[in-house]
Each structure stands twice: as C-alpha cells, then as structure tokens.
A protein has these predicted regions:
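Anionic-ligand binding patches
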Residues: 1-156
Length: 156
C-alpha cells in the first residue's frame, strides 16, 4: 500500500502497464473525515478490518462520530485516477466531493459509506440519489471529467 490515494492509484496502474505493455488506468478512492484527521482515508474499504464489510465500516464510523455535532462532521470523498503509459509517462487526476457525515443511514442506493455521506449543496446522501444525480456530483465522476479535459486538450 502507498500512503495516499494518488500513490495507490499509481501502484495499480504501473503494475498493469508493466504486465501488459499497454496504457493502464487505475483508481483509488475513499472517504476522508476532517475531525478524524482524514480517516478512514486510504483504509476506507477495510476501516473495520478484514474481510471488508460495508456495514461494519459504517457502524465503526458512526461510533467514532457519535460525540460530534453536525458542524464538526465535515468530510469529503476523494478519487484519484492514474494513467500510466508504457514509456513511463504518468498522469493523475483528482476528484473531490465535499459533504458531511450524517447521524443515521439514509437511502437505499449505492455502496460503502453512501448512506452516511450527505453531499454539500443537497439535502441527500449518495444513497438517496439516483444514479444520474450521483454521477453529476460524485468524486469519481469529477476525476473522470478532469481526465477527459486533459485528453481533449492534449490528444485531439
């Protein structure tokens, strides 16, 4: 494991590029909670331990957040996409969605921390959004958009 989303995405993409000899794209993403000093961060998928379990991760997060009022529950979802070329060129693209951690599960869609993450500028968690709504605001969609802008500028 690397020490950041960027490092982890690059590790994955480098390995794929090395094995295939082709352009490789990989990502790493997770939830970062301000009051928890960025946790769960790069350990988002295994916050409650191995094997990974979304419900256990959410329960651990709710327990860690139980004493914090709404104004202290600031969080962000981060996605970094890495592109590695066989010639060694590397590029990364970041997407961030700001929000806060709710006090209870809300919504039926999505996975992971989606039922707890209230997206800034909305009154919805990721899990309450339709796929189209989530795709407009998600950290992964934003990283993909940044990657697309780069390639439109330099490869057209």
């Amino acid at each position: 494991d690397g020490d950041s989303f960027e490092e982890n995405a690059l590790i994955k993409a480098r390995e794929i590029a090395k094995r295939t000899g082709k352009i490789a794209i990989a990502d790493d993403s997770g939830l970062s909670v301000d009051i928890l000093k960025g946790q769960p961060g790069i350990y988002s998928a295994r916050f409650a331990g191995e094997p990974t379990d979304d419900h256990a991760n959410n329960e651990k997060l709710l327990d860690r957040m139980k004493d914090y009022e709404e104004s202290l529950r600031l969080a962000k979802f981060v996605c970094v996409i890495a592109v590695v070329f066989p010639n060694g060129l590397e590029k990364t693209f970041k997407g961030i969605t700001m929000g806060r951690i709710g006090f209870e599960y809300r919504g039926e869609h999505g996975f992971g921390y989606d039922p707890l993450f209230l997206v800034d500028g909305t009154d919805k968690t990721y899990a309450e959004m339709t796929q189209d709504e989530k795709n407009r605001v998600s950290h992964r969609a934003r990283a993909l958009k940044n990657m697309n802008h780069f390639y439109e500028k330099y490869f057209r």
